[in-house]
Design a protein with these regions (language model features):
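Short beta-strand elements
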Residues: 107-111, 177-186
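Hydrophobic residues embedded in beta-strands of well-ordered beta-sheets
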Residues: 11, 115, 145-148, 177
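Cysteine-rich micro-motifs
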Residues: 154, 158
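Small-residue-enriched alpha-helical segments and adjacent helix-cap loops
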Residues: 1-123, 152-153
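Short, conserved aromatic-histidine micro-motifs
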Residues: 121-131, 189
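Short, catalytically relevant binding-site loops at active-site mouths
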Residues: 96-98, 147, 186
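Iron-sulfur cluster-binding cysteine motifs and their immediate structural context
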Residues: 127-146, 159-176
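A hydrophobic, small-residue-rich beta->alpha segment in the mid-to-C-terminal subdomain
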Residues: 175, 184-203
Length: 203
């Protein structure tokens, strides 16, 4: 057969002759074991045809905007849901930039942080205010040379953290997430996923 890499980084082997199926399954078994994929019966190949890979952006391991380790969280989800024949798609993104397009999936997880402000480190330069205004939702303002965050407007993106030159803004130790549901692409009814939970924790 021929190996095909799907858009969700899944491997498909096309054109296998039926008489070669047992041999191919035997060759695949070490790979399935190494990936720790749930399997009811060894030697029978991958146990589901409809499973969609969980997708994730690069997360905070590399990206300065990422609010959490997306790959680690994605692996936890994979262990809980694989294998299955449900044609639903899950995506995780580290911040509100949504590079993975989580809102276009059935189930999207968007990383959030609750910015922590230390007025003793603040020099009132206004870099965070400008950054939030230009790149996010304009949730910051200055009062008496101190920054005030509008908690209702803040989307937890962390732009203020990346813009602050003195580390007066830092990310919260606790990780938060925005969960979106029922996003989809397609010809007839494409739609963005709607918020289901905001400021949720991993549990």
């Amino acid at each position: 057969g021929q190996i095909h890499l799907t858009t969700r980084q899944g491997f498909e082997i096309e054109g296998i002759h039926m008489e070669d199926m047992d041999k191919v399954n035997e060759m695949l078994q070490p790979i399935i074991d190494n990936l720790q994929i749930n399997q009811n019966e060894a030697g029978t190949g991958y146990p589901a045809s409809g499973t969609r890979n969980v997708c994730a952006c690069i997360g905070n391991r590399v990206c300065p905007f990422g609010n959490y380790n997306t790959a680690a969280f994605a692996k936890k989800i994979e262990k809980a849901i694989f294998p299955n024949d449900l044609h639903f798609k899950i995506a995780l993104t580290g911040c509100a930039n949504d590079c993975i397009k989580a809102r276009m999936h059935d189930f999207g997880i968007i990383g959030m942080t609750e910015p922590q402000y230390d007025p003793n480190r603040c020099v009132s330069c206004g870099a965070c205010i400008k950054g939030c205004d230009k790149l996010s939702v304009d949730a910051l303002k200055m009062e008496n040379y101190r920054i005030v965050r509008n908690e209702e407007k803040c989307v937890g993106c962390g732009v203020c953290v990346t813009k602050c030159p003195t580390r007066a803004w830092t990310r919260s130790t606790k990780k938060y997430y925005r969960l979106t549901l029922m996003g989809r692409t397609g010809k007839k009814n494409p739609r963005l996923g709607e918020d289901f939970l905001i400021w949720a924790d991993e549990d």
